[in-house]
A protein has these predicted regions:
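Juxtamembrane/disordered regions of integral membrane proteins
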Residues: 1-124
Length: 124
């Protein structure tokens, strides 16, 4: 079980890092506009966030043998809460970024699940 969670975490972080790298300028410009300074990630909350996301994916999809659609929807719902909360709180949070986040959440969970299943040959 621990090896599976570690593998899932590695896949999740690598896939997410690739996306963050591709869209970094959009976020840097937006954060600069909203908070008046550049984006600076805090290590402990970042790790906590990934632990929660990966644990959710493992428990609700991998462990319970959910479908790929379930994985997509779980990511969509989790990132949807994040996106809509940001749009509700920050007056300058663009709808475009909210929709990107929402969509990415679904695809991140789907891609991670697909890669995990194919690497481990597990059934879901």
């Amino acid at each position: 079980m621990i090896k599976n969670i570690i593998l899932l975490a590695i896949i999740f972080v690598l896939v997410d890092a690739g996306f963050i790298f591709l869209i970094r300028n959009t976020y840097q410009n937006m954060i600069q506009k909203i908070q008046g300074s550049s984006l600076k990630m805090k290590l402990v909350p970042t790790i906590a966030c990934y632990v929660i996301l990966i644990s959710s994916l493992y428990y609700f999809i991998i462990h319970k043998k959910g479908s790929y659609l379930d994985a997509f929807l779980l990511g969509l719902f989790i990132y949807g809460v994040y996106s809509t909360t940001n749009m509700a709180i920050f007056k300058d949070w663009p709808l475009k970024v909210g929709l990107i986040d929402l969509t990415w959440g679904g695809f991140l969970f789907l891609i991670t699940t697909y890669l995990f299943v194919n690497l481990t040959k597990k059934q879901i």
